[in-house]
Amino acid sequence: MTAKDLHFYEPKNGHGLKHDPFNAIIAPRPIGWISSWDTNGNINLAPYSFFNAFCYHPPIIGFSSTNWKDSAGNIQETKEFVWNLATMDLAKEMNATAAHVARDVDEFKIAGLTAAPCKLVNVPRVAESPVAFECKLTQIIQLQGADGEKAQAWL
């Protein structure tokens, strides 16, 4: 491969392609299907495409919330959340939970899912999902660009 075969991409200058290469190249991305609830007992279930594992020992996972959303606020309040595996069989239900709804609307009900109790956290998990990680918050970080300017995204 020669230099002329490469496409150089500097985000501030755009890319001239049909689709954003950042999203297309970093794929497939696992979905962080995050269940949480607030201190008033309002349940939230939402998918996040910026999700991954970050450390083996101790096991650490994380997701990025673009703009401050209910999930981030709930987790900051209660210090707990659950990551639920979104399988192909659950894709329709997962997409239904992406709807922008009022804080007191239960996405489990919208998607026809069952909220099941967990063993280590008070947050419910998706009973239909074959895997659920019960998580405790360690930190929330507001992301920033290389120029030091704060982004409207939290990890």
Residues covered by each model-derived region:
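Active-site-proximal mixed secondary-structure blocks
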Residues: 1-44, 52-155
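Polyanion/phosphate-binding surface patch
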Residues: 48
